[in-house]
């Protein structure tokens, strides 16, 4: 199971098949796929900070470039799409590769999970008109074991291996951490996730840290762009509300 698949399974409700409202889900899945490529020995990083790098240097890891060392297909639709994105932009910074992968990451991962019998694809129509697709669990055994592992790390204080640490770092800030534990344990779990996400460079491989840094940088960029769009939209609405019509109507007539 890929790290990206683990992330997506945690985001999809087992019973309803609905995907949670996750902040920049596609970007986070793309970062996970980048880490999965490194774990599969498909890529190396150029220009990445080394072990012992300062916090400022680590934060710039998303500017490292990705060198594909093995371009043979993996047979996994999402992983191969991510590999192709890296091949298509050999000189682009990792954060740009994350953006490219994010465009179809969720769709590809869902298809892979359905193909392997982990999820089911249910299609229906809302009000007999609007198509709706849900992805309820078909086999939740892996997710059950995954949640148990995450609980040990987030609540019981167990040290994560690189794979689990990477997943938690990507989950941090997504809004999903609180749903992994009981209500009374949420604050502690979120604090533990923040601790792991901000841990020293040596906790994971350079490639994995680059994937995480690229994801964080891309999430921040998307967030700023979204905020700017909202502000501009609000300003436009206010301008429209206060604009004087070119041809004024009589006082008793409603203002357009």
Task: Label every model-predicted segment.
Residues 1-105, 229-256:
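Short, amphipathic alpha-helical interface elements at domain boundaries
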